[in-house]
Amino acid sequence: MKAISPVRSMSSCYQAVCCLSEQSLSIARGSSLKGAGIDETMGLLYDMNGCYSKLKELVPGIPQGSKLSQVEILQHVIDYIFDLQIVLGEDQQQNSILNLQKSDFSELATQGDARVCH
């Protein structure tokens, strides 16, 4: 017989109490641990499907209303992240070039001012 953790890590006390009461009811009814494991597995599967649906909504470039496999959704997500990294890299590169140009210009300006004054 496997041990069941009486309290799962949950954000609120209310959810922990509900979890305990559900476990107590399943023990009192005499349900097997396998049934609880299957229910938990199905719950995780539905959660993952929900996550894939949310990714389809959030990531641009994924055609809405089309049936895509989970692998295809993940590939779109990876491509989108890669595109974001490229854009952020270009922005950082442009900012560093602008900062370099500003520093060169300010150095030239101070040298030019010195020449004018002398």
From Swiss-Prot:
Database matches in Pfam families: HLH
Keywords: Biological rhythms, Developmental protein, Nucleus, Repressor, Transcription, Transcription regulation
Tree of life domain: Eukaryota
Sequence ranges assigned to domain bHLH in this UniProt record: 32-84
Molecular function GO terms recorded: bHLH transcription factor binding; protein dimerization activity; transcription corepressor activity
SUPFAM superfamilies membership: HLH, helix-loop-helix DNA-binding domain
Compartments where found: Nucleus
GO annotation (BP), single: negative regulation of transcription by RNA polymerase II
One of the record's GO cellular component terms: cytoplasm
CDD domains: bHLH_dnHLH_ID3
Subunit structure: Homodimer. Heterodimer with other HLH proteins. Interacts (via HLH domain) with the bHLH protein hes4/hairy2 (via Orange domain). Interacts with stat3.
Task of the protein: Transcriptional regulator (lacking a basic DNA binding domain) which negatively regulates the basic helix-loop-helix (bHLH) transcription factors by forming heterodimers and inhibiting their DNA binding and transcriptional activity. Influences cell fate decisions in the embryo by sequestering and blocking the activity of the bHLH transcription factors that control these decisions. Inhibits the binding of myogenic bHLH-containing complexes to E-box DNA, thereby preventing activation of muscle-specific target genes. Also inhibits the activity of neurogenic factor neurod1/neuroD.
Name of the protein in its database record: DNA-binding protein inhibitor ID-3-B
Gene source species: Xenopus laevis
High-level lineage: Eukaryota, Metazoa, Chordata, Craniata, Vertebrata
Gene expressing this chain: id3-b
